[in-house]
């Protein structure tokens, strides 16, 4: 391991190529000092074992009152990562507040409830495959799979769960993508956050007047029945989190899985020949090309030593999911290889790409189910589907939080 003085890694706001950076940083240590936008100093946990320990550590908090630079006024209002730190919801809450907020939505994402959603997901998938084929026919045989398939499926599902009418969905998609962008101008970041909150507040007001069998109506009822269960800020913050997390993760998961299978035809043939399952594809994609690269934020409540590195109290720390997924110390010397048989191997290490501990991704069962259905139906119908441009020409998503590409042009095959 390289023991020369460590220069903080300046994260590329435009996304860059995380796997190359991760490999270089992991060769040095399991943790890396980083420079966030606005020259805010932070830390990233990259190694699998270190990340697993950190995510479950009792002296690590999510509430931004522990964020030293923010508390001291060194973070501006237009900071592109501010929503991740300050949104009022379960991802920025600790202890009893976290349990209270999580309990209000957890019943919508149980394994039983997710299975009840499967027929609707299959119905939406079938309809979107028709749209994808029409889009390809209208454009010389090429269609953007991300736009016509990978995006509208999870966005449609989460909006139906929340009771969001179709006319709002495109605006919510656009605002969500701006909120998670890390290369956005300060004034645009402020405007995107303001507009997203305003749109969701309007949706909540409409559901308050006309309640339905949806999660937003249930949250409003919880707010109105007992004011101490959910504040108005927490209601809107929860909707912000549900909209963003409810589609961005699955969007990137489906996109990255299609890229992986097109780039590894032997693995696709293995799955189509029943040598591995679509669930295996989902798990290997989550490990090999995690939909979230660096997730903000956690803060040590005291100086914390992790894997031999001291993280000062109040440091904003990123969870390096994409790095941990390819950590050879956990996943072996072939960690960089996409292998759909890996998840079923005896002794295979489970990835951390959907989190660990009390903040484990609430929507994980839904994301897995949506991706599994989408991939199976897509490649069953279009087994010769392939990228329309070389992988190296795909433009990266403009974020070091999300990990994917902006568009995914594909040919559907004969």
Kindly give the residue locations of the regions a language model identified.
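Cytochrome P450
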Residues: 1-414
């Amino acid at each position: 391991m390289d023991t020369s003085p460590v220069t903080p890694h300046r994260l590329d706001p435009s996304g860059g190529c995380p796997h190359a950076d991760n490999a270089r940083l992991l060769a040095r240590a399991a943790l890396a000092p980083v420079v966030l936008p606005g020259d805010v100093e932070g830390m990233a946990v990259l190694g699998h074992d270190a990340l697993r320990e950190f995510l479950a550590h009792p002296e690590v908090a999510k509430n931004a009152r522990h964020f030293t630079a923010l508390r001291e006024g060194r973070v501006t209002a237009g900071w592109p990562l501010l929503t991740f730190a300050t949104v009022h919801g379960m991802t920025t809450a600790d202890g009893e507040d976290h349990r209270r907020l999580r309990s209000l939505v957890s019943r919508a994402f149980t394994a039983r409830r997710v299975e009840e959603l499967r027929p609707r997901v299959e119905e939406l998938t079938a309809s979107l495959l028709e749209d994808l084929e029409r889009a390809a026919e209208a454009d010389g045989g090429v269609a953007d799979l991300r736009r016509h398939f990978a995006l509208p499926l999870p966005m449609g599902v989460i909006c139906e769960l929340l009771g969001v009418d179709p006319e709002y969905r495109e605006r919510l998609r656009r605002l969500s993508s701006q909120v998670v962008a890390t290369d956005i101008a300060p004034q645009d970041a402020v405007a995107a956050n303001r507009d997203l909150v305003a749109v969701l507040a309007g949706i909540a007001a409409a559901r308050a007047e006309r309640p339905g069998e949806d999660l937003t109506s249930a949250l409003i009822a919880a707010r109105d029945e007992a004011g101490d269960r959910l504040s108005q800020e927490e209601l809107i913050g929860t909707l912000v989190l549900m909209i963003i997390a409810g589609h961005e993760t699955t969007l990137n998961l489906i996109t990255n899985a299609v890229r992986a299978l097109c780039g590894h035809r032997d693995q696709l043939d293995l799955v189509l020949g029943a040598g591995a399952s679509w669930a295996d594809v989902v798990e290997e994609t989550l490990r090999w090309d995690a939909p979230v690269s660096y997730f903000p934020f956690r803060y040590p409540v005291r100086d914390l030593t992790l894997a031999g590195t001291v993280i000062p109290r109040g440091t904003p720390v990123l969870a390096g999911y994409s790095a941990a997924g390819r950590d050879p110390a956990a996943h072996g010397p072939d960690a960089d290889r996409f292998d759909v048989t890996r998840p079923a191997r005896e002794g295979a290490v489970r990835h951390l790409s959907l989190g660990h501990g009390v903040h484990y991704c609430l929507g994980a069962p839904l994301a897995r189910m949506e991706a599994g259905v989408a991939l199976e139906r897509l490649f069953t119908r279009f087994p010769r589907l392939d990228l329309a441009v070389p992988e190296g020409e795909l433009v990266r998503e403009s974020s070091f939080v999300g990990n994917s590409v902006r568009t995914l042009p594909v040919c559907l095959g004969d």
